[in-house]
Every structure is written in structure tokens, then in C-alpha cells.
């Protein structure tokens, strides 16, 4: 399935005003389970930081994580980078109108982006599955972190991440829900090895999207996006659909962030320089 066209439509719908963009961020916060996991990790990290911090939002997209960080602590300086010019322009316009002067945005390719020893935290949410040269990006992240700086990653795992499933009984062919991914997901061992090869000394990997998260993702993301990929007319019934499933999906999200998972379709990775 092509995910980018849906994102462009959503961007066009919610870019009309500052309040609509804020509403869009709130909806993403409620519906995207990975946001719950990332914010939990950021809150834990923030308790180790006294005062100002420099943060890189690597693959900032719609800018919802930069928005969260910029509002959480005005002394933090956030740089969001992305390869999509329209998203950088949208974020620059919105953050200026919202009066958030501690966040800036830059068009950049992560395979070439290095700011030597500049950041206390680098955030990479659902980005690495889109980049073929991941080893180069991990090395760039390492070089761009300050000593003891933290890299925080959310990415699909190899346990069914990207909703990968076999197409026949022989299990020799697989398809992914998201066509734009260059890899279906990482194993714990693979991403740990690649990060250590990049220079990181301490790597912690935990599964996200366990059984509760998988149910929530299907209800809140897979089924609606699949319908929208058929016809944009389904936008009309989405509010009714989400009212019907929201509280159950919320319960599943709460369970997912509070349980330890032996397996899951997502990974939350923390790597320290």
C-alpha cells in the first residue's frame, strides 16, 4: 500500500490554520501507539537533563515530536530535518505562527547529515525502515551526539513489522502493508550489531506493539488507511468509526506501554554514546 499519498492528503486537510494543525497533532498522539512509547522514553530521559539541551528530530515529518519537545521545555533547542521539502516548509510556517522559536527545520539527507558532537538527544521515529544505507546513518548519528548523548529509535521489528505476511503456503513470498519501506523490520540482534559497529557502547532494545498494540494498530491505523487507499470518500465516515473504536484502542495502548513483551512488531531502541 502507498502510504505517502494518504499523508499528503492529511497534511493538506490540517494545514489550513494553526488550530487545525494542533488538532492534527493531538489526533496523532491519541492514535499512534509509537507516540505513547516515544513520549514515555522522552519523559524518562528528561529527568536526567538539567537545563538546556540540543535535540535532533531526524526525519521530523509532520513535526509532531518537535512540537512536543519544543513545548515541553523552552530551553531545549530542536532541529527537525527531513528529505521532503513540503513537510519542512509546512513545519517552518506552523512553528512560526505558533510562536515556538526554539524549533527550526532543515531540508537534509540523513545519509549525509553530520553535526559533530552537537546533540544531547537524537530522535528517529519510523525513519530507518525507509533508508537503505542505515549503517551510514547510524554512524552519522553517533558522530553528531555529544558524549553520553542518547539516540532514541522507533522502528518495525522482524516479527511482523510493517504487517509483513506470507502470500502462499510455502512461505517463500512476503508482502508488506507499507510499500515505501526498504526493509520489513530489524531483529534485535541486527540493529544492536549495526549500532555497536557505528560506535555505540550501550544499546538497549525492547519490543513494542505486543499483542495489545497489534490489535490497536489494526483498528486505529491499518483498517482506516486501507479504506482511504481505496477512496478518499471514506474520510467522511472516519469520525464515526473512531468514536466507535477509540476507547477499546486506548485500553490496548495502555496495556502495550505498561507490559513487557517477549515479542512484538515494533522496537524501541536506546543507544548511548
Predicted regions and their residues:
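S-adenosyl-L-methionine-dependent methyltransferase catalytic module, highlighting the catalytic core
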Residues: 2-37, 64, 83-87, 94, ...
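Conserved SAM-binding loop
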Residues: 36-46, 50-167, 269-271
Amino acid at each position: 500500500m502507498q502510504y505517502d499519498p494518504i499523508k499528503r492528503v492529511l497534511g493538506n486537510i490540517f494545514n489550513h490554520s494553526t488550530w487545525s494543525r494542533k488538532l492534527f497533532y493531538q489526533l496523532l498522539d491519541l492514535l499512534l501507539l509509537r507516540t505513547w512509547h516515544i513520549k514515555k522514553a522522552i519523559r524518562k530521559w528528561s529527568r536526567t537533563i538539567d537545563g538546556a539541551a540540543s535535540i535532533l528530530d531526524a526525519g521530523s515529518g509532520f513535526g509532531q515530536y518537535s512540537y512536543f519537545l519544543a513545548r515541553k521545555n523552552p530551553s531545549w533547542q530542536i532541529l527537525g530535518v527531513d528529505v521532503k521539502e513540503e513537510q519542512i516548509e509546512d513545519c517552518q510556517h506552523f512553528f512560526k505562527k505558533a510562536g515556538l522559536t526554539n524549533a527550526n527545520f532543515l531540508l537534509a539527507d540523513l545519509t549525509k547529515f553530520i553535526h559533530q558532537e552537537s546533540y544531547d538527544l537524537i530522535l528517529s521515529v519510523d525513519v530507518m525502515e525507509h533508508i537503505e544505507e542505515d549503517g551510514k546513518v547510524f554512524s552519522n548519528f553517533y558522530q553528531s551526539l555529544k558524549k553520553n548523548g542518547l539516540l532514541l529509535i522507533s522502528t518495525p521489528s522482524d516479527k511482523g513489522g510493517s504487517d509483513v505476511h506470507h502470500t502462499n503456503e510455502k512461505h517463500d513470498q512476503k508482502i508488506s502493508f507499507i510499500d515505501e519501506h526498504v526493509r520489513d523490520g530489524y531483529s534485535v540482534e541486527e540493529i544492536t550489531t549495526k549500532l555497536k559497529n557505528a560506535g555505540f557502547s550501550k544499546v538497549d532494545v525492547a519490543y513494542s506493539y505486543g499483542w495489545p498494540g497489534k490489535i490497536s494498530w489494526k483498528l486505529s491505523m491499518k483498517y482506516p488507511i486501507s479504506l482511504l487507499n481505496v477512496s478518499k470518500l471514506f474520510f467522511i465516515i472516519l469520525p464515526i468509526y473512531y468514536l466507535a473504536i477509540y476507547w477499546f484502542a486506548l485500553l490496548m495502548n495502555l496495556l502495550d506501554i505498561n507490559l513487557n513483551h517477549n515479542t512484538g512488531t515494533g522496537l524501541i531502541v536506546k543507544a548511548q554514546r
